[in-house]
Amino acid sequence: HIASIDNEDHTVIMIQVENEIGMLEDARDHSPQAEKAYSGVVPNAMLKAVKAKSGSTWGEVLTHDAYGDEQFMAYWYGRYVERLAAEAKTVLDIPMFVNAAMNSRGRRPGEYPSAGPLAHLKDIWHAAAPHIDLLAPDIYDTGFKQWAERYALPDNPLFIPESRCCPNSGARALYTMGEHEAVGFSPFAIAQSSAGEQREVRQAYSIIDELRPLLMTHRATGRVRGVLLDAEDRETVI
């Protein structure tokens, strides 16, 4: 549908595949089909992703706990998303990303939407879903800078598709662009936010647009930095 109606203006520049995919209440699926897969041979791509030196079945390669179960589930979630993305790109070849709900507040796999495209599972997701261009964090919890840093990686440009819309949203947009050369920053439900919150974001976007030539000139040179000071971070050393 998008390919047919947007083939001239190219309004759609990126597509999100699934939304905060993950497993809740348990770390992995225990259906008969999943148990059969768990007793099967681990694909080579997964062995490389977890740097396994021995073992052939999932039970031999992974730890027998919630974290091992999460890794198993992450690979197969990734394979499912890969099939969707690969097929979609045969019709419309534009960047595609998957977003993640964060594993915050000390929760264990199954207590948060586990096995999604989380930072500690990025190697598994990259191995399982090579047609996915970005793994993207939805940041609603405290520690904004720390969450952003986990996704701003050489093999994963930072894009924040969801973040709590708040008075700091404008500053966070400027920080992600300056410090991490982010692809984008998108506060959630901005249309329902207060006029003051919208004003901060609009002003930040306007500044970024004005700075775009300068930012592009110095992109990947290490000469552009971002500073974010708030109640959580009271100082930054550059």
Which role does the model predict for each range below?
Residues 60-68, 95-111, 147-175, 179-183, ...:
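Active-site clefts of carbohydrate-active enzymes
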Residues 107-143, 147-152:
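Extended hydrophobic/aromatic segments used for targeting, binding, or gating
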Residues 174-238:
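Aromatic- and carboxylate-lined catalytic core of secreted/periplasmic carbohydrate-active enzymes
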Residues 1-122:
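Polysaccharide-binding and catalytic clefts of secreted carbohydrate-active enzymes
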Residues 16-21, 100-102, 136-141, 162-165:
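Short, flexible loop/turn elements at secondary-structure junctions
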Residues 6, 125-126, 176:
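A general structural signal for stabilizing positions within well-ordered secondary structure
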